[in-house]
Amino acid sequence: MKERTKATMEEKGENKALAISFLKALGYNEQQRECAVTLWTRESRFDHLARPRDSSGKPRSTAFGIAQLLRERSGEPELQILHGIRYLGHRYGGSACRALSHSDRRGWY
């Protein structure tokens, strides 16, 4: 049986709702939540199976999942979201908007 490489639309919707819920529970205000949603929509469309691929379909990076983290290996959306939030905290002082601004300028975060 072929391994799935994409989440369903329903799974993506559930992942997005879960991310918003986690961000809210962790004290991210509405603006910061919107920035995180914009960023992760751009990165993966909330697909927990997402990997960047070239035109032939081969992976072009080790980035994986909702937040497209380089060392992410968990297929669990909950863990991917929590790791993504932790990365925002470590790299951008907890500011999803700062991460989004960096992504706007550089094409990555």
Predicted segments with their positions:
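Peptidoglycan cell-wall recognition and remodeling modules
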Residues: 10-109
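N-terminal secretory targeting signals
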Residues: 1-11
